[in-house]
């Protein structure tokens, strides 16, 4: 499949998102440049002679989230060019996750050629830009739920919806004030109650086990520690959300 066909679907989805988000000329160029960047200049991992080219059709959730975080942090620094470029790269990898490689990859190029003939379903773009949450956890779930498909129309629909939802989540900066209030509340609970409870129960268990030369006190303390850690999960989520909104976690 020639390069223009491989880029066609990415650019079509990108242009639809750029139109709906009303990006300026400069923002649009950076975004669309980013969305074809992985095909234009293949990313590599490792260093020197041990480096290898990254297969973007097998891009990991971690790699996509790396570009998502780089985009978000760039926007928080008012570096819109880098923000839109990294967002475009993240969406490229996300869209490629929708395309099944087939047996030994032999059908992949043919599937991409058929996909290039598909029109972008604007209903999926609009739906994605409505049905989102501006949180890193939402973005991660969207990535993990994107599955390789074989039917071109289903591929285009899934790629369009997930790309629009992730783009909207990354671009939405309206929740910073509320996220800051919630994080401060949970941070106080974490510092005064849950962290001391988890650490204290574990310390008591270890101390009694050493004094009694028995593992049972430690075994008894472990469930209390796990319970305290479980109760503290909202704090950890709020800490990620605070970072997402450029708020100090401490």
Q: What label would you give each PLM region?
A:
Residues 1-78, 85, 103-176, 195-203, ...:
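N-terminal, motif-rich segments that launch catalysis or mediate targeting to/interaction with membranes
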Residues 80-83, 215-216:
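Structural motif marking the loop-to-transmembrane transition
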Residues 82-104:
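Active-site alpha-helical segments that house and flank conserved acidic catalytic motifs
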Residues 178-196:
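Juxtamembrane/start-of-transmembrane alpha-helix segments at the extracytoplasmic/lumenal side
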Residues 211-220:
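Short, aromatic-rich membrane-interface segments at the entry and exit
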